[in-house]
Amino acid sequence: MLTLTNIKKVFKTDEVETWALQNVNLEVKKGEFVAIMGPSGCGKSTLLNILGLLDTPTEGAYILDGKDVSQMSEDDRTDLRKGKLGFVFQSFNLIDELNVSENVELPLLYMGVPKKERRQKVKEVIERVAMTHRAQHFPSQLSGGQQQRVAIARAVISRPHIILADEPTGNLDSKHGKEVMDLLCELHKEGTTIIMVTHSQHDANYADRIVNLFDGEVVSEVEMWEADQTNPADPPPTPPCMEGSGYN
């Protein structure tokens, strides 16, 4: 589905150059759940921004569904982002002046979806995240877990192929964090590709694969079924997300 080849990212000021990413090579297959881990400042969010077409690499190639997006115009990148990608952020990024339904509806407005179709889709996705009873409430009236469920509803309403999640449980307690991770798992089971940046080993345990970054480089990749398999002769175990094991 997507391939990064020798991706580099440098941030320049008048006095210094800071290399955020160096020679990153990464492939994510359709339907995979990949967790990206590493210490603060290692380049995780920069990598996610490049994957999400919110930033461009200084060097290297990014192929998404067979297209070299690093060579696209900004307008073409925006169109591709709207059609294929959904975003979930640690800080929720809901608009305070809009209620739950209106926040969830926003991506469809930008896509020019007719009003009647928008309303039906909003109703369905809000029900999916168990927020129907809060549809007319504003973000300030919701708990952190409820706000993140609304953010996920907004991310998936356009049926994106890929969800990019940046510390989706970072502002939540363990109970609400589990609810959010279980919801991401449901989407993964339905075939959505998920790429998640996290500091939490608990959350990473939901993934099929963990990619570890250090100082802007990929230093290791771990297939979770391999990590759990003690006897190579045994059949591969069920991927962790399919078992919902992250907070057990």
For each of these PLM feature ranges, what is it?
Residues 209, 217-242, 246-248:
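Conserved beta-strand-loop-alpha-helix hinge in the C-terminal portion
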Residues 214:
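A cytosolic small-molecule/anion-sensing beta-strand core signal
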Residues 1-207:
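ABC family nucleotide-binding domain
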